[in-house]
């Protein structure tokens, strides 16, 4: 069952990549205690693939939606999308204001990568529940390979994919729960 879910999540991420021609992508799922757990991380140019069917554990703690003082964690881009249900499109993380990109910058320093454009989209199901977040990184011009901002029309396609994906994930979980019930 878990393998089937991982395959579904990977299909969703790969479709988002196809739509946007992005280099990196992360899928987070909402935990029962309202945190965003890293499920799959991929960055093609770094040959970086963790979670999902890779068998590689993701060594990062889940993203807290709420800080220790109980305030919403609006400074983390994934948490912001998970809390508000809003898509966040950032053309250049190094020039963006209002979000904390210190973790991103640390990753870049360690790997020599340059995280630039971000598209972060909540996974909202048919009951309007946010069940996860997809974060895409570094859209690329299909001709030159140069990193570009995520285009608005591609954002709309990804948002549509995410709402369909959230319904598929919710349905898969319900079916799996029913199977367990009848075993």
Residue ranges and their predicted role:
Residues 21-25, 87:
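Short N-terminal helix-loop-first-beta-strand/juxtamembrane motif that initiates sensory/input modules
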Residues 124-130, 139-142:
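Flexible loop/coil segments at beta-strand boundaries within sensory signal-transduction domains
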Residues 181-182:
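Signal-transducing coiled-coil linker helix
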Residues 83-87, 133, 156-178:
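Signal-transmission/dimerization alpha-helices at domain junctions
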Residues 116-125, 132:
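A short, aliphatic-rich beta-strand micro-motif
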Residues 26-72, 77, 95-96, 134:
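GAF sensory/regulatory domain recognition
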Residues 73-78, 86-87, 91-117, 139-151:
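Signal-transducing coupling segments at domain and membrane junctions
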Residues 1-17, 28-31:
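Signal-transducing coiled-coil linker helices
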